[in-house]
A protein has these predicted regions:
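Short acidic/glycine-rich loops and adjacent helix/strand connectors
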Residues: 12, 51-52, 58, 121-123
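Generic hydrophobic/packing signal
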Residues: 3, 92, 103, 113-115
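Short small/polar-residue motifs
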Residues: 19-25, 80-85, 115
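A structural detector for beta-sheet-dominated domains
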Residues: 27, 37, 59, 118-120
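Conserved glycine-rich phosphate/nucleotide-binding loop
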Residues: 105-124
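A conserved acidic, glycine/proline-rich C-terminal tail/linker
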Residues: 34-108
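Anionic-ligand-binding alpha/beta catalytic cores of soluble enzymes and soluble regulatory domains
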Residues: 1-50
């Protein structure tokens, strides 16, 4: 029997000019990839092309945890070993990973509504 049901807050995706904000929902523990709440359709509002660079910023509460330029790729082969990559995962959500590494371990990133991610298209 269930004694109590706890509702968890859902972080809504915010779409602004050249920027999408969401939450880090899942850590793929086998590979250390981050799976975000940002859907493929939401990310496509930025009109990404494979090979485009994005400024990726991760916050835990209000603390900056990670900020770097990351390539949007079709597969991990699109970046060198040890480099970060943005990709669409099997759930049609935006993922962030390190080729042959653990993004979660490298930057001590967790999951939940207090972990947010911003993806900003770099023009040019």
């Amino acid at each position: 029997s269930v004694e109590q049901i706890v509702e968890l807050p859902v972080v809504a995706t915010i779409i602004e000019d050249h920027l999408v904000k969401g939450a880090i929902d899942i850590l793929d523990v086998r590979f250390g990839s981050l799976w975000t709440s940002i859907t493929r359709e939401e990310f496509y509002k930025l009109e990404p092309e494979f090979g485009d660079r994005f400024e990726v910023t991760i916050y835990h509460a209000d603390m900056l945890v990670y900020q770097n330029q990351v390539v949007y790729g079709k597969s991990f082969a699109d970046v060198r070993i040890g480099q970060p990559i943005l990709y669409i995962n099997s759930l049609y959500r935006l993922g962030l990973a390190i080729n042959q590494g653990s993004f979660a371990k490298a930057y001590n990133v967790g999951v939940g509504s207090s972990w947010t991610i911003e993806i900003k298209k770099i023009e040019g």
